[in-house]
Amino acid sequence: CKETGSNQFVGNWPGVTVEKKEGRLKGHKDVIVTDLPGIYSLSPYTLEEVVARNYLVGERPDVILNIIDGTNLERNLYLTTQLVELGIPVVAAVNMMDVVKKNGDKINISQLSTELGCEVCEISALKGTGITEAAEKAIKAAQSNTKMIPQHTFSGVVEHALAHIEEAVLHDMPEGQQRWYAIKIFERDEKVLAMMNIPKDK
């Protein structure tokens, strides 16, 4: 990894065979980068999704640097909206921008940032461009502890239900975490229901 150099630890996540990679960020000895498995959603259907979700929800890192494939934007943005809902500062780095431009396509980074409610920047992992800048933006977001305000909203009925769940069930939880848990309870997510001791048929 270019940004961590050779100072990297590779092992497995506890209890599973999914590889775990961690390293210190070049020029920032106090910054540890944890490379999570590549996923498209926080729904725990695959082992990779379970590992990534458990880490994000349980460990609550200071910031999430979400690498997005610019050539397949729509598929990647579903995860980004879920990450913003976690209440953890998010920086979305749109990768393969060189390919996007070569294909004659355009991505309005400023508008995307507004729509997602998080910082968005361009990178090309292949050419090594924008990576240091993305890391610096992530550090800045972590240090400022920017409050994430999800821009994605549901229909009025669903939003009303989510507000009711937050008030009735999640009032003791930090405000920034309530929306994600409310959505998962609304979806009848088995792992969240079990964690919150909520009967499945309630």
Annotate the PLM regions.
Residues 117, 144-202:
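Extended helical scaffolds that flank P-loop GTPase cores
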Residues 10, 40, 44, 71, ...:
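Catalytic cores of large soluble enzymes that bind and process phosphate-bearing ligands
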Residues 3-4, 56, 68, 138, ...:
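Hydrophobic aliphatic residues
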Residues 35, 95, 124:
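Active-site glycine-centered loops adjacent to acidic/histidine catalytic or metal-binding residues
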Residues 14-18, 32, 48-51, 60, ...:
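Helical mechanochemical/support elements of P-loop NTPase systems and associated helical scaffolds
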Residues 23-29, 51-121:
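Conserved C-terminal guanine-recognition region of P-loop GTPase G domains, centered on the G4
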Residues 98-153:
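Canonical P-loop GTPase G-domain recognition
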Residues 1-47, 57-63, 85:
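Conserved G1/Walker A P-loop phosphate-binding module
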